[in-house]
Amino acid sequence: MSYAIIQTGGKQYKVKAGEILKIERLEDSKPETKIEFKEILAYGDDKTIEVGSPVVEGAKVEADLVENGKNRTILIFKKRRRQNSRRKNGHRQQYSLIRISKIFSKDGKVLSEAEKMVKPTKKVEKVETEVASK
């Protein structure tokens, strides 16, 4: 199974095809769009590894944006004792949820590809009810 180490949002992630990942929010991106990551620090599989200095030129990772959202609230509470001085603040960090679809090598060959994601459709069965009459 191939993997790649990508850099986005000031952080580094080890990704595999088909994996769902929560990363820092990507600007100007709408759900159901394709995203390309070109800052690939390394990629490889069980046998070989290709390490860049600092990035591997020509390698890329394609992903699908699943959704944009906000994490849960983190409370910041500051208090100065015996002075009746306190401050309460909250913060919700924004994130993007992505699904890795393809990993490309520096030659442009596809190293690994995720299976097609089929959206489940709701199957509605007709239910008949009998009304009791008096």
Swiss-Prot record:
GO annotation, cellular component aspect: cytoplasm; ribonucleoprotein complex; ribosome
Any Gene Ontology biological process: translation
Keywords assigned by UniProt, alphabetized: Ribonucleoprotein, Ribosomal protein, RNA-binding, rRNA-binding
GO molecular function: rRNA binding; structural constituent of ribosome
Keyword presence, Ligase: no
Entry keyword annotation includes Transmembrane helix: no
Purpose: This protein binds to 23S rRNA in the presence of protein L20.
UniProt protein name: Large ribosomal subunit protein bL21
Encoding gene, per UniProt annotation: rplU
